Amino acid sequence: MTVRIAINGFGRIGRNVVRALYESGRRAEITVVAINELADAAGMAHLLKYDTSHGRFAWEVRHEREQLFVGDDVIRILHERTLADLPWRELGVDIVLDCTGVYGNREHGEAHIAAGAKKVLFSHPGSNDLDATVVFGVNQNQLRAEHRIVSNASCTTNCIIPVIKLLDDAYGIESGTVTTIHSAMNDQQVIDAYHSDLRRTRAASQSIIPVDTKLAAGITRIFPQFNDRFEAIAVRVPTINVTAIDLSVTVKKPVKASEVNQLLQKAAQGAFHGIVDYTESPLVSIDFNHDPHSAIVDGTQTRVSGAHLIKTLVWCDNEWGFANRMLDTTLAMAAVGFRLDASASTKL
């Protein structure tokens, strides 16, 4: 069965989802039937074809009126501001990938379903009242047909959760801290300008800028046992893509750095293949651009202090890796089937 999807919001994640769909060879499994975006069709086509981070798209892209052509495929373009006006029922949409970054609570998800979609996948953590939050590779097997409104968590949550699980399963995590070293994003300023966050009034290309993060909450949403045992901070740096995460955890069992690396390398080659990668090459952030993994462990940076404090450095392409996980989760949601009785919903 080919899953019929619509994309709401054609920004960084929305466009990368389309690119990843074609580049990963999963077009036979997923069809994009419509994209809803307030920008005009010419701009949508241009930014899909040409991308500063990811280069030129290999497929032919063109537009005619309100249709986007990717190769031989025709995708309907919509410009609806109100979720209730979206024609998902008319288009036979199975799953909406809401990539706006604006919508993300149960009411928004129900609006997509009322418009005719069978399920909704948000491209950010969303509110606590959703049916499920999925970090693919860790908990997607808990999805059920009645989980209709789902979050794909965040790029940084997808990056760090697999590593936390591996370390906890092996050594028993007592507590931890996380520092996200994140590329600049489009909620920052090119030159100094007004913003409600005074640090983000400053030019993104000229400073390392501390920002708020909900990553600790994202960790405990997946692993409730770590409530009040993880803290996180984040800084934005003057690069346009790729993120590094500094993870420090205290563990119950004594361990050596070489043992930590052996564990993570084995997982990358085995149970977490395709989700986690491992390297000991002397690489820098740009070398991970366009990497489809959720997490790439840099074994050269692993440290252990006092046998119980582990520090690791984990890289991710915060756009491309996450876009690939959106596709993975979409297929997982479709694989468990569609149960349309809203009263049967049970929270994951």
From Swiss-Prot:
The gene is epd. It comes from Salmonella schwarzengrund (strain CVM19633). Coiled coil: none annotated. It is found in: Cytoplasm. It comes from the Bacteria. The keyword Manganese does not apply. Homotetramer. It catalyses: D-erythrose 4-phosphate + NAD(+) + H2O = 4-phospho-D-erythronate + NADH + 2 H(+). CDD domains: GAPDH_C_E4PDH, GAPDH_N_E4PDH. This is D-erythrose-4-phosphate dehydrogenase. Its main location: cytoplasm. Transmembrane segments: none annotated. SMART domains: Gp_dh_N. GO terms for biological process: glucose metabolic process; pyridoxal phosphate biosynthetic process; pyridoxine biosynthetic process. Its EC number is 1.2.1.72. GO terms for molecular function: erythrose-4-phosphate dehydrogenase activity; NAD binding; NADP binding.
